[in-house]
């Protein structure tokens, strides 16, 4: 059940990276319609040092834009790695997304996905300087057997220049567990309205993990998203694709590194951030499936470059059907 909950919540969060519809019922939003995820494409990429990376991911299901002041190009490489991972994994789960005029977000998806992602292929990228070929990536894409999600899992609206997605948490829990969770609405509201220390204690108890190290600002941000909706950005790219994404301000609390007060075997300070703490707790609680646990290393990679990050956009790359 935990595995299904993880994948369902991940799917809903991916759906939540887009939204559209104006609060004025007299206006028809230009975003209403059905969208496919962008086609996975790649080309050889030549670095300034005259080195070439084969099959460099150009487009795919995941949109990334990472600007930085670091002298080397490590963040640029990680950004391409994200495009590869998102472009490889999301098409194994998601077929299309419909923005309903009534305000619902509806997806055609794989109910119980079997994700094909060999961790050794990621390691190989670092050692060989080449990404898998487009044909190898597309070989695992799902083309049939999709399920249509209920209408009430997530809703969208446009407010103050942002596209806001409101998750229906009881409905999501009902879909994930198969048991009616509609009566949990008041309980969930009480938890989300609690002070950060109470929320950390409750979540820590559920996961059997210590979450006291997470900043109060991060807890307030997450509970605000759960109660009031997730504010996102949307734009039409030069190639006509629709990019729906969270920007750097959404990630600052999560990725900024700080010292734990401990030192490693080399006498250097041990650093952490809130997303590392939360991810490790989800892994320890059995919420993150085994095949997805290695993704934690990318949280550390991003955190290591966050102090030199000037712009960071992460979301979906979509094409109107």
Model-derived features: positions:
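Intrinsically disordered, low-complexity coil/linker segments enriched for acidic/polar
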Residues: 195, 288-289
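Short, exposed beta-strand-loop hairpins at the edges of beta-sheets
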Residues: 300-309
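Tryptophan-anchored aromatic micro-motifs
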Residues: 28-66, 70-73
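Bacterial Sec-dependent N-terminal signal peptides
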Residues: 4-5, 14-41, 308-321
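Contiguous, well-ordered beta-strand patches that form the walls/edges
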Residues: 77-273, 279
């Amino acid at each position: 059940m935990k595995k299904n909950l993880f994948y369902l919540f991940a799917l809903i969060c991916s759906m939540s990276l887009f939204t559209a519809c104006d609060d004025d019922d007299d206006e028809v939003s230009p975003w209403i319609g059905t969208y496919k995820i962008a086609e996975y494409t790649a080309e050889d990429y030549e670095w300034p040092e005259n080195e070439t990376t084969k099959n460099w991911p150009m487009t795919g299901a995941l949109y990334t834009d990472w600007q930085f002041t670091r002298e080397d190009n490590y963040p640029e490489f990680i950004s391409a790695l994200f495009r590869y991972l998102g472009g490889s994994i999301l098409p194994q789960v998601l077929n299309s997304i419909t923005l309903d005029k009534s305000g619902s977000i509806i997806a055609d998806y794989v109910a119980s996905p079997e994700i094909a992602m060999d961790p050794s292929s990621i390691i190989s990228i670092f050692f060989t300087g080449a990404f898998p070929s487009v044909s190898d990536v597309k070989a695992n894409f799902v083309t049939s057997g999709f399920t249509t999600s209920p209408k009430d899992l997530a809703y969208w609206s446009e407010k103050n220049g942002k596209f806001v997605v409101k998750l229906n948490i009881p409905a999501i829990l009902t879909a994930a567990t198969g048991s009616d969770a509609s009566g949990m609405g008041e309980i969930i509201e009480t938890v989300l309205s609690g002070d950060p220390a109470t929320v950390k204690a409750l979540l820590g108890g559920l996961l059997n993990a210590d979450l006291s190290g997470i900043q109060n600002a991060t807890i307030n941000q997450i509970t605000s998203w759960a109660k009031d909706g997730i504010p996102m950005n949307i734009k039409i790219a030069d190639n006509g694709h629709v990019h729906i994404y969270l920007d750097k301000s959404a990630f600052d609390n999560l990725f900024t590194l700080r010292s734990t007060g401990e030192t490693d075997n080399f006498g250097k300070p041990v650093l952490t951030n809130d997303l590392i703490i939360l991810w490790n707790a989800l892994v320890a609680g059995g919420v993150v499936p085994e095949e997805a646990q290695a993704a934690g290393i990318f949280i550390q990679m991003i955190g290591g470059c966050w102090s030199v990050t000037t712009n960071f956009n992460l979301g979906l790359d979509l094409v109107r059907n």
